[in-house]
Amino acid sequence: MGPITTTNLLFYTFSDGEKLIYTDSDGIAQYGTTHILPPDEVSYINLFINGILQPQPLYQVSNGQLILLDNQPPTQGSSIILQFIIIN
């Protein structure tokens, strides 16, 4: 059995200090993909806010949308990175 091929895609954006819902249009193309992939097309999804891995119960991902399930948005300027890992 040879090496397992994987793909690692990253969706980057920054918090405006107000929103809890982010869409494809919030993605910053210079840093990564601008498309939020649907969970059924990837093997794993990880969310990092300011570099800290977030527990899965704190967010929902669907095709084109990230919803933060918190009553407070991240501080303005906080980095939001959604990592998609695809194991082929």
Residue ranges and their predicted role:
Residues 1-46, 53, 82, 88:
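Extended beta-strand solenoid/passenger and fiber regions
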Residues 46-49, 71-73:
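Glycine-rich loops and low-complexity Gly/Arg-rich segments
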Residues 55, 59-88:
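Surface-exposed interaction regions enriched in Ser/Thr/Asp/Glu
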